[in-house]
Regions:
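Beta-sheet entry/capping signal
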Residues: 74-76, 182-185, 236
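Polybasic, low-complexity association/targeting segments
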Residues: 1, 21-29
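Long, hydrophobic/aromatic-enriched structural stretches that serve as scaffold segments
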Residues: 77-85, 91, 135-164, 186-195
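N-terminal nucleotide/polyanion-binding subdomain common to many enzyme families
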Residues: 28-36
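Adenosine ribonucleotide-centric catalytic and binding domains
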Residues: 74, 78-125
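Compact, glycine/acidic-enriched structural inserts
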Residues: 11, 18-20, 105-157
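Short linear interaction motifs
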Residues: 53-79, 155-159, 163-169
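Long, contiguous domain-sized segments
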Residues: 2-11, 15-17, 36-48, 56-58, ...
């Protein structure tokens, strides 16, 4: 039986029973107060965790003009990875397969053809080797594949198998193709593998986790070495976060006794950057101008872990600790009511001309694409494994393992 109108009405009354102590106007006022009085800098228990770079400011520009500005970089490459999602087989194996790809703008068929595949395998069978196998090449050397066996890292093994596959594929692909990038490389997502911090429920620090597991060590080392590689070459490396989910800023504000009527950091910044004008009896959103913040140096949450001292991450690094710190700004697009985050290693952000170039490129791309920059969108499309491909790959794995998927009713009904 589907929902009838009477059901919709009944459900809607539930929302009316929930108290709303803060209306949208009050939320904007609270956000404005936090912006004006709490972020220059914002202090945590061990010092400043968020600091403006060259002053705190909000910037705006007409969307049409930003979209038509000249290109800042002659070429831009993007990199992303996608998976078939964790799948359990009747032989006891939990498997995920990730594909990483790099985009080039302007397009390059050779770059787009290149692929890196990582298959992560977990088993409760203690006799299964928890290590990394050698790389296998195919497609005349354009494809590389590797099987890795994960160990018991966290309570949610599916999350670990999935995360390791994505991170290993993306980071290996980026490192293996780093030398073809001449002007700018953009990761589809944060600069660092921040989900690994969420696996610390059984471990005191990331360094403890790294010391216990070679795969986590490889992931963390790859992303830190990627920064080093691009700093050494003098080519900027950027992380473009399409859907920021962090709550580290909100938690810190709450710990300082400040009101936080927002679910995420992105919701706070969206209220700070949204501009409204009076139209008759209502306030309407200004939709023809992008708004964005200044750059901030961040030690919030996972940012502080990866930008911290060597003993905190468990990996030796070739640059000063401060070079790895995350420096970011956020862009608000009023056409879609979406917020995007742009991350840059401090080693690059120290130079004003680099910050300005990245800022101009990012806002221009968001204005022109009405969403993520074209190199990011292309990398996402290249790396994505669609539903039909997932089904075929799963069938191939069943034949290879000589077993069936350990299915359930949800998978049968919903195809998940």
């Amino acid at each position: 039986m589907t929902l009838d109108p009477v059901h919709y009405d009944g459900i809607a009354t539930l929302a009316e029973r929930i108290r709303h102590d803060t209306d949208p106007d009050e939320q904007r006022d609270v956000a404005e107060n936090v912006w004006e009085n709490a972020l220059d800098p914002l202090y945590g228990d061990d010092g400043a965790v968020l600091e403006p770079v060259d002053g705190q400011a909000r910037r705006t520009g007409p969307i049409d003009e930003l979209a038509l500005q000249p290109q800042i970089f002659e070429s831009v490459h993007g990199v992303d990875s996608g998976t078939i999602n964790p799948t359990t087989f009747k032989n006891g194996l939990l498997v995920d397969l990730a594909q990483a790809a790099m985009s080039a703008t302007p397009s390059s068929l050779d770059v787009h053809r290149n692929r890196t595949y990582i298959m992560t395998v977990y088993s409760n069978d203690v006799s299964v080797d928890h290590g990394m196998e050698d790389w296998t090449e195919f497609d005349d050397g354009y494809g590389r594949a590797r099987v890795v066996h994960t160990s018991d890292l966290a309570r949610d093994q599916e999350r670990v198998v999935h995360g390791l596959a994505l991170y290993l594929a993306e980071s290996h692909h980026a490192l293996n193709n780093a030398d073809i990038v001449d002007d700018l490389l953009v990761l589809d997502g944060p600069l660092y593998p921040k989900q690994t911090v969420h696996w610390l429920d059984r471990h005191g620090t990331l360094a403890d986790l790294v010391s216990e597991d070679d795969l986590v060590e490889a992931v963390v080392a790859n992303y830190l070495h990627l920064v080093e590689r691009f700093v050494d070459r003098g080519v900027p490396l950027v992380g473009f976060v399409k859907s920021p989910q962090s709550q580290a800023l909100i938690r810190t504000l709450r710990d300082r006794g400040l009101p936080t009527p927002w679910a995420t950091d992105a919701a706070f910044f969206a209220r700070v950057l949204e501009r409204r004008e009076r139209e008759g009896d209502t306030d309407a959103r200004v939709r023809d101008e992008l708004t964005w913040t200044n750059w901030f140096r961040s030690r919030l949450g996972a940012d502080g872990v990866f930008g911290g001292a060597d003993q905190e991450v468990g990996v030796d690094r070739g640059l000063a600790q401060s070079a790895y710190e995350v420096v970011f700004f956020v862009i608000y697009d009023p056409r879609t009511d979406l917020l995007f985050k742009v991350e840059l290693p401090a080693a690059f952000a120290e130079r004003e001309e680099v910050r300005r170039a990245i800022e101009r490129w990012a806002v221009g791309e968001v204005a022109a694409q009405r969403g993520p920059p074209l190199p990011v969108a292309k990398a996402d499309e290249l790396a994505r494994i669609d539903r039909g491909q997932k089904r075929e790959l799963t069938r191939r794995l069943e034949r290879g393992f000589d077993t069936d998927v350990d299915t359930n009713y949800d998978r049968e009904r919903w195809g998940i």
